Amino acid sequence: SSIIGIGLNVNQSDFEGIRATSLANIKGSNLGLIDCLAETLEAFDNIYGRAQKGDLDEIQKEYHSRLFRLNKEHPFRIKGDKQPATIQHVDEHGNLILRTASGNVTAGIKEIEFLF
């Protein structure tokens, strides 16, 4: 069995550094927590229903189209070395595939660091 958790910064407005934001910062005003929860659950239900109907390829395309910094070169720390890389996609195992000067790199969770 597995437990999956999702954390959302809803109405927080101040963050140390630039690594995080909140829905309130994006929208420009605070959100009602119950309404936010209802919209989030509705979105999950919609995607789950589509997955049950076999719409996995389209869901995956939508997911990839929203990846942060997709197809844009950005500095990363890979195996301790700072180097530019370009996010290509996420594979079927959840690994991030990056293009570097020396070739493609496959990285699992906590194996690379996105540098700001």
Role assignments for model-derived ranges:
Residues 1-116:
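Long, positively charged amphipathic alpha-helical accessory segments at protein N-termini or as interdomain linkers
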